[in-house]
Amino acid sequence: MARKKVDMSEAYDYLREKTGSYVLCFDVQNLTAFNNISRKAGDLAILEEALRIDKAATDDMMVMRIGGDEFALISGLYDLDTVKVLAEKVLSKNGRTIMFEGRELPLSLYYGMIKIPESLRYSEFFTDMHRTITNSKK
């Protein structure tokens, strides 16, 4: 997977341009089970999560890793129904397995959504994205 260097001020400007649009937040369900097998299995689960999100995203969307196994997809979309279709593209793969050392391991993701606020303060929004993920687990 290619890495792209991003200046955080550029990311902040991108977020400000997308004010009011939806952000989809994702997290691996039960990453601990993968890590209990091995850290490599956990890393593979995170990589697969990123690939699933990236495949659903269009070129004008931004995917950000916001934590160990937590990602945000900045959709730039304002229509809730369109956002739900996008989320379903990612979630439709829940339960599909990944292969690790000859073992099939089912991978599923949690997800929540949040809008980019009018008065964007990155630190607060970052906290809100994490809260969105936490709430999706309930």
Q: Can you annotate each of these PLM segments?
A:
Residues 13, 84-91, 101, 108, ...:
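Catalytic-core segments of nucleotide cyclases and related cyclic-nucleotide turnover enzymes
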Residues 64-66, 94-110:
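Catalytic core regions of nucleotide second-messenger enzymes
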Residues 2-22, 29-54, 64-68, 80-84, ...:
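Conserved long alpha-helical elements within nucleotide-processing catalytic cores of c-di-GMP signaling
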Residues 74-78, 95, 116-117:
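Residue-level recognition of strand-loop junctions within catalytic nucleotide-signaling folds
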Residues 25-27, 113:
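Short hydrophobic alpha-helical segments used for membrane anchoring or interfacial signaling
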